[in-house]
């Protein structure tokens, strides 16, 4: 879960979400990413959800831009311009090349190893080493999502949103508020 900033409208749903995950018998750790202060905010909200069947791992952002690879996703956090410390996020999902069954058959790769090879895993079995490059074509275009919220226009948004398949940009003000904001 990536937090942009710690205003109530962006964090107050966390306790309910944590409790729902716990009730759904989640046991694997949950990673939270957010600006500096994340641990303090999460601990305060955990008063409502103190007992969970999974660990919470917090990553506090300290740089103007940081990139992580988690669970196969490449996540880039970048600062935007709000009245509190605030980040936007770009999430990219890389995609392997297409599986070539003909190549797998030509190389006598047993069917039971096709699935892990298709997922990009190397298989060592029966004295043989099977690698994804033996059966996968060139990498395919991945999926890129960019999310930003509660910010004034800044160059970093344009740079990160470039070539996104989905760009979500929540604005604070509508056209009717333009003149009032200019006056501020």
Stretches found by the model and what they are:
Residues 62-184:
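Metal-dependent phosphodiesterase/nuclease catalytic metal-binding core
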Residues 37-47, 58-63:
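A gly/proline- and charged-residue-enriched helix-loop-helix capping module
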């Amino acid at each position: 879960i990536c937090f942009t900033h710690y205003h109530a409208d962006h964090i107050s749903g966390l306790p309910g979400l944590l409790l729902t995950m716990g009730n759904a018998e989640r046991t694997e750790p949950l990673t939270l990413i957010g600006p500096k202060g994340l641990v303090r905010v999460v601990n305060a909200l955990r008063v409502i959800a103190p007992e969970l069947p999974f660990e919470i791992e917090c990553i506090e952002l300290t740089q103007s831009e940081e990139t992580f690879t988690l669970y196969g996703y490449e996540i880039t956090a970048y600062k935007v311009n709000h009245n509190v410390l605030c980040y936007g996020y770009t999430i990219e999902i890389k995609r392997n090349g297409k599986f070539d069954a003909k190549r797998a058959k030509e190389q006598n790769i047993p069917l039971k190893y096709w699935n892990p090879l298709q997922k990009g895993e190397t298989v060592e079995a029966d004295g043989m080493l099977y690698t994804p490059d033996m059966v996968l074509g060139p990498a395919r275009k991945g999926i890129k999502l960019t999310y930003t919220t509660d910010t004034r226009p800044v160059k970093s948004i344009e740079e990160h949103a470039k070539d996104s398949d989905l760009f979500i940009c929540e604005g604070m003000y509508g056209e009717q508020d333009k003149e009032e904001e200019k006056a501020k």
